[in-house]
A protein has these predicted regions:
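Functional transmembrane core segments of multi-pass inner-membrane proteins
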Residues: 12, 125-234, 276-285
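Membrane-proximal soluble regions of multi-pass membrane proteins
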Residues: 29-101, 256
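Interhelical loop and helix-boundary elements at the membrane-water interface
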Residues: 79, 92-102, 141-155, 194-207, ...
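Short microdomains enriched in Cys/His and/or Lys/Arg
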Residues: 84-125
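Structural signal for the C-terminal ends of transmembrane alpha-helices
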Residues: 118, 140-144, 165-169, 241-246, ...
Length: 298
């Protein structure tokens, strides 16, 4: 590896900091944009006309501002991580505390981008996986905050996985990716309807189907079982912890998207083959242990 190549993760990680700053905007604004669109659609359906034109609100406009006092942030207050440290985690104008989640998301994005560069170097594969990581992180945070998995993110993630597979930028071929997308969607769809018929309740949303299909497109159908098992175990552990700490939301609902995303990150970092090997080893070990106990009993 050349001297420049050794520093690839650093340069790409710095780019990740910038993307992380933008992800904070996406995570906060996209759900609000969706709600505003739903309100407009409902008003149009009812034949209502808004009294005033709503101000422009999208991912670019208006500029970022303090949610407490409305202070518009200058460019030097928007520098990833450094601005938070320099301002000591408080708004420059009103001194209201700024959530540490903002720099943490920036750091997480930088770390994921650096891992991609470390693994694939400066290549189209790194570009593809950085896009995957950023989108998955945004989806996880939005779902945790709002229980929404926007089609504006899940569907592009799915199609990007198929395109990346066709271009040879992932570890799976297009056929395996296609089957992964189809199997991912249908499997959760069947579980959803089975649960609803048995209990009369909805155990998950359609966004979960699309996210699982997207993971199938990126990792192929063989990775679907390890991904769903890992996400289910993590979700169960966190759910139990929240229940005992009285941290569950009203109705006891926990969004499943963040746990699917966590399993997706694990598959990206360690590779789907290693996840499958760990799963098979665990199942094999449990079966062998059970067989030994039965033999001793006999």
């Amino acid at each position: 590896m050349t001297w420049f190549g050794v520093w690839d993760p650093v340069w790409v990680g710095l780019v990740g900091l910038l993307f992380g700053s933008f992800l904070n905007v996406v995570i906060y604004r996209l759900p609000k944009m969706m709600e505003a669109q739903w309100d407009r659609d409902c008003a149009e359906h009812l034949g209502q006309t808004p009294a005033t034109q709503a101000p422009t609100f999208n991912l670019m406009v208006p500029r970022s501002r303090c949610q407490a006092c409305g202070h518009t942030l200058s460019w030097y207050e928007n520098i990833p991580v450094l601005s938070y440290v320099a301002l000591r985690g408080r708004c420059k104008a009103c001194k209201t505390a700024i959530s540490p989640r903002y720099p943490l998301i920036e750091i997480a994005t930088a770390g994921l981008f650096a891992l991609c560069a470390q693994r694939w170097g400066i290549s189209f594969s790194t570009l593809a996986w950085c896009g995957f990581a950023a989108t998955l992180l945004a989806l996880a945070m939005i779902d945790w905050d709002t229980t929404l998995l926007p089609d504006d993110l899940t569907l592009p993630l799915l199609w990007a996985g198929l395109i990346a597979a066709a271009a040879g930028w992932t570890q799976v071929d297009l056929r395996t990716a296609l089957w992964g997308a189809v199997a991912g969607y249908l499997s959760l769809w069947l579980i959803y309807w089975g649960f609803k018929l048995l209990t009369g309740k909805e155990g998950m949303g359609y966004g979960d189907f699309k996210l699982y299909a997207a993971l199938g497109a990126w990792f192929g159908w063989p990775a679907l079982l390890p991904i769903i098992l890992i996400s289910s175990v993590i979700g169960a552990v966190i759910g139990i912890a929240l229940k005992f700490s009285s941290g569950l939301r009203e109705g006891g609902y926990i969004p499943f998207g963040p746990f699917l995303a966590g399993a997706g990150f694990a598959a990206m970092i360690w590779g789907p083959d290693r996840l499958q090997a760990v799963l098979l080893g665990w199942i094999g070990g449990r079966s062998e242990e059970r067989f030994s106990r039965n033999a001793e009993t006999d």
